[in-house]
Amino acid sequence: MNQKVILHLDMDAFFASCEQANDKTLKNKPVVVARNNDKSIIIAASYDARKYGIKAGTPIFEAKQLAYGELIIKEGNRDLYEEYSERIFNLIKEQFTYKVEVLGIDECFIDATNIWEKYGNVQNLCLAIQAAVYQETGLTCSIGASFTRLFSKMGSDMKKPNGITIITKENFKTLIWNKSIKDVIGVGSSSLEKMELLNVKTVNDFVKLDEKIIAESFGLSGQKMYQKLHGIKNDEIAYWETSVKSISKEKTFDKKNMAIEDIEEILFNLAEKVVLRMQKNNILAKTVTLSIKFYNQEINFDKKQHKKRRTYSETFGEYTDSIEKLYSRVKVILDDIYDGESISLIGIGVTNLIEKDKLVKQQSFENIII
């Protein structure tokens, strides 16, 4: 049986980084996400803000003093963060593996047991994931790789931002056991109080305790933590084993008033990427969708249409993976709806999918019936 290879992907300063990726004028500036109220607490801080000593939990009034005259406060945009999150997790499922357990808006576990060898080694796989996420979103992520969930999750926090930490059966005692017991995920405040009484300050102090003392002092949870810190068990990833239901690519624009020819060229490039992904997955599509978002915020968008964007779909008479058919159809849609407004995002997607092999079998069966 192959040893598990579990990755934990954690986006770097996610909320603040989304704001910077969405507005290029914020690049390399101290950006924080919080209510613009001196009594408010910062929810997220960009790495540029952290250079001033600002971090999540810092009061706004203090942050303004630390980055006097430089601090940029964004009040938060949940739709934006969810949009980036969805793009990231869909990308991983479509390009790498469907064995993804989403933990929150900015982190997930990935079971890479059966895919890492394609990349030569685990390091190369992690680099490929980081590159794909950055190319898709302009955001960086840190990845921990190990044979258990706990070690991979702790690893993703060791070399931020944009870092990779691989924890093996050979090095986990060096990388994990030397850390403060406070850094271990799952150790609560009540357990920490008991550990102080036992003079436990590091993971090494804890694992050296007699197992009987651990059972008496911390009960079943302490025994489980003891096992986890020895790399025992804790290696299952909860994922939904579903086939691909849609494939899409989109592009946000940094500048307004782009020429229609440039927009059409970008749309064609997006269509090419969608078709390449379809062909990689041996998939045909029957429905194509154009997604479009405008800079003019006064437009009365239908919020149900995927986060303030307009979508237009058309269905073909037969399944296809033809770049010519897909692009020509969305170009006709674009020509019909475009009236010169500045576009902030454009995308193309396909749904109503079928595997080529299944379609061939289906057509063969229909021919027999006929």
Give names to the regions the model predicted:
Residues 1-185, 189-370:
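Basic, low-complexity intrinsically disordered segments
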